[in-house]
């Protein structure tokens, strides 16, 4: 999983791809209209692929609806990602400050950890000795 | 003679020959170079492994081939015809010919002086018809101007270096709003594009260009935000590490404490017995005061032989705690009474 910033960038790229796909869908599957009653729609030639692949109105409507929904969903994802970007309230100085503090705390904690490990080892040795002497008995 | 032979073979062979300086890698040269490196390292007080390159080698010797070449002096070089720079920096939008929408991020010192100029170039470029097929390929045209106009390193390092060098106290709280505005504008512009295309397809290119500008701006803002995000992530990582370390310390202490309590409990019960055993040897000596019951027809308090001593030992290890001690005492009392009865009968 990548960080949120990369996720956001990918989401934006996907939004762009969806734009293109949506545009292509409408461009490809719309129906043809006449400007005046006298106009006629020329039948497409048999040896050429048709310019538009008109879908039945209800199918076309449904497709449009689905694509629009997808767009809105993607947009919502993007906005969610934007609002969850980390550390928008921190300035650079705040960040550097907290990094320094964390570093010191880490040093202290590491020392404490080593002490605890040493202590544990000592107790372990004692326990081991005791157990050994009992077993021998 | 040898040179001409080399040239001939280089022309004739299908694969190119290795570079000519491979002959410089003789054992004596390697030895000499290692010595120079060692000397250089000791002079500058750094470990030998950290010496990448010894400057000021005699230029006429073969030794210069034994180390990587120096960095380019002006910080730029070309790779596959593309100019590369030592300073990896984000190119400002304006210099890529893209109109900047909204305020620049805090920390980036990009000025908007060239704004009017870029807008004119932008509108000029939009006179070309832009179909949706060319859209994805033209979405990142920034490479084109860069390859034509390699910027001097001093000017490219300025915007990128400013954000890391001088730390700003401004926050990024306006970024939310800006990004949300941009994404909303994207949707709206796409809707407008569809509307325009349904009425007058020839006029759609302007809208497509707008969309392009919006997308580029979005990406640019995100890239400007990257250093900030990297620092943020570092903070998160350190916090996690800190928590982990503390948890480990606590767990270690808890275990040590528990073990010590067990030891103390054992010590109050067992340790005298352990000492007795250590003195008396491993159960073969019959002198221990507490072991003593079994087949020998002797009253209980009197010590008995070793055969029964081991069984007593086993039994004693099996139980522990104060309860065991009491049980032990009762056992001895019962046993003693039994032997007492026997003694009476015999007498």
Curated annotation (Swiss-Prot), chain A:
Keywords: Activator, Coiled coil, Nucleus, Transcription, Transcription regulation. One of its GO terms (biological process) is regulation of transcription by RNA polymerase II. Pfam families: Med21 (PF11221). Residues 37-56 are annotated as: Disordered. InterPro entries: Med7/Med21-like, Mediator_Med21. It is found in: Nucleus. GO terms for molecular function: transcription coregulator activity. GO terms for cellular component: mediator complex. Residues 87-130 form a coiled coil. Belongs to the Mediator complex subunit 21 family. Component of the Mediator complex. Component of the Mediator complex, a coactivator involved in the regulated transcription of nearly all RNA polymerase II-dependent genes. Mediator functions as a bridge to convey information from gene-specific regulatory proteins to the basal RNA polymerase II transcription machinery. Mediator is recruited to promoters by direct interactions with regulatory proteins and serves as a scaffold for the assembly of a functional preinitiation complex with RNA polymerase II and the general transcription factors. This is Mediator of RNA polymerase II transcription subunit 21. It comes from Neurospora crassa (strain ATCC 24698 / 74-OR23-1A / CBS 708.71 / DSM 1257 / FGSC 987). The lineage of its organism: Eukaryota, Fungi, Dikarya, Ascomycota, Pezizomycotina.
UniProtKB/Swiss-Prot annotation, chain B:
GO terms for molecular function: transcription coregulator activity. Its main location: nucleus. GO terms for cellular component: core mediator complex; mediator complex. It is found in: Nucleus. Disulfide bonds: none annotated. Residues 97-172, 302-326 are annotated as: Disordered. Residues 108-171, 302-312 have a biased composition (Low complexity). Component of the Mediator complex, a coactivator involved in the regulated transcription of nearly all RNA polymerase II-dependent genes. Mediator functions as a bridge to convey information from gene-specific regulatory proteins to the basal RNA polymerase II transcription machinery. Mediator is recruited to promoters by direct interactions with regulatory proteins and serves as a scaffold for the assembly of a functional preinitiation complex with RNA polymerase II and the general transcription factors. Belongs to the Mediator complex subunit 7 family. This is Mediator of RNA polymerase II transcription subunit 7.
């Amino acid at each position: 999983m990548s960080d949120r910033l990369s996720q956001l960038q990918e989401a934006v790229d996907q939004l762009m791809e969806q734009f293109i796909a949506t545009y292509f869908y409408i461009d490809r599957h719309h129906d043809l209209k006449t400007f005046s009653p006298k106009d006629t729609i020329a039948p497409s030639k048999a040896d050429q692929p048709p310019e538009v692949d008109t879908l039945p109105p209800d199918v076309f409507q449904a497709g449009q609806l689905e694509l629009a929904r997808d767009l809105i969903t993607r947009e919502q994802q993007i906005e969610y990602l934007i609002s969850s970007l980390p550390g928008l309230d921190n300035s650079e100085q705040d960040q550097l400050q907290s990094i320094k503090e964390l570093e010191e705390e880490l040093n202290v904690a590491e020392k404490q950890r080593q002490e605890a490990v040493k202590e544990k080892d000592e107790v372990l040795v004692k326990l081991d000795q005791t157990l050994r002497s009992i077993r021998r008995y | 003679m040898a040179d001409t032979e080399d040239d001939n073979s280089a022309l004739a062979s299908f694969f190119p020959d290795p570079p000519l300086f491979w002959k410089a890698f003789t054992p004596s040269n390697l030895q000499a170079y290692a010595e120079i490196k060692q000397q250089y390292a000791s002079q500058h007080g750094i470990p030998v492994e950290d010496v990448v390159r010894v400057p000021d080698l005699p230029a006429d010797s073969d030794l210069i081939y034994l180390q990587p070449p120096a960095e380019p002096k002006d910080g730029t070089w070309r790779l596959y015809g593309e100019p590369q720079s030592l300073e990896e920096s984000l190119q400002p939008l304006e210099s890529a010919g893209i109109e900047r929408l909204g305020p620049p991020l805090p920390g980036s010192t990009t000025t908007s002086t060239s704004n009017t100029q870029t807008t004119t170039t932008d509108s000029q470029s939009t006179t070309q018809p832009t179909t949706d097929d060319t859209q994805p390929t033209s979405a990142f045209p920034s490479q084109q101007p860069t390859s034509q106009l390699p910027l001097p390193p001093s000017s490219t390092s300025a915007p990128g270096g400013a954000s890391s060098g001088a730390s700003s106290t401004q926050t990024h709280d306006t970024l939310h709003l800006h990004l949300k505005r941009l994404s909303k504008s994207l949707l709206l512009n796409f809707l407008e594009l569809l509307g325009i295309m349904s009425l007058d397809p020839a006029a759609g290119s302007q809208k497509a260009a707008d969309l392009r500008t919006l997308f580029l701006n979005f990406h640019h803002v995100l890239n400007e935000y990257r250093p900030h995000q990297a620092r943020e992530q570092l903070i998160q990582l350190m916090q996690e590490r800190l928590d982990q370390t503390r948890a480990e310390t606590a767990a270690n202490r808890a275990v040590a404490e528990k073990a010590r309590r067990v030891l103390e409990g054992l010590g109050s019960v067992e340790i005298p017995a352990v000492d007795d055993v250590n003195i008396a040897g491993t159960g073969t000596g019959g002198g221990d005061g507490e072991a003593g019951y079994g087949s020998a027809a002797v009253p209980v308090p009197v010590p008995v032989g070793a055969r029964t001593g081991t069984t007593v030992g086993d039994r004693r290890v099996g139980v522990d705690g104060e309860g065991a001690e009491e049980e032990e005492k009762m056992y001895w009392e019962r046993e003693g009474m039994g032997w007492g009865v026997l003694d009476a009968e015999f007498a």
